[in-house]
Amino acid sequence: MMFRKKRVKVNSRVAHSQRSLKKGDVLTLELPQDKDYGVDVEKGSITVLYEDAHTLVVNKDPFMLVHPTGQTKSCTLSNYVAGYYAKKGVVHKVRPVHRLDRDTSGCILFGKTKEAQQYYTDELQAGRIDRIYTGLVEGCIDSDGVVDAPIGIDPVFDNRRVIDEFGQPAQTEYTVLCHDGDH
């Protein structure tokens, strides 16, 4: 497709797919530029933890959605990331690589390009990116352990996940950091 759209050049000249490269040739690929953010742009406070030309990592506060859904179209992290891009004067479609539940806070990884988003998605699916959570539980867990069970959609609350023999494989290692009364 890039050849058809004349986005591949060798030595500043449009190249054809059969063209062989020689030592010293300069290959230039013109990647398509985003024309919009993909979500409504909103001003909002975000904390950028890391950023480079391909990647944006932002802290998600609790009680916020990562992206707009059927009923919630505004005040999401993605809307605020679009506002952040707009304030910087750049246009990147907002591409979250993963999500966190509404009530959960933590790092959200965004790809600034379709290629970066796909790369990080592939890395997550291959298990080469770790997700580490800190949580507070009610009751007393005596020792560290592993929950190795498939996760599926809760039949009662479709926005929750439960252990489900037909769900996706999942493994959670946990470490008890401390005990405090009933927690």
Language-model segments: which ranges?
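RNA pseudouridine synthases
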Residues: 1-183
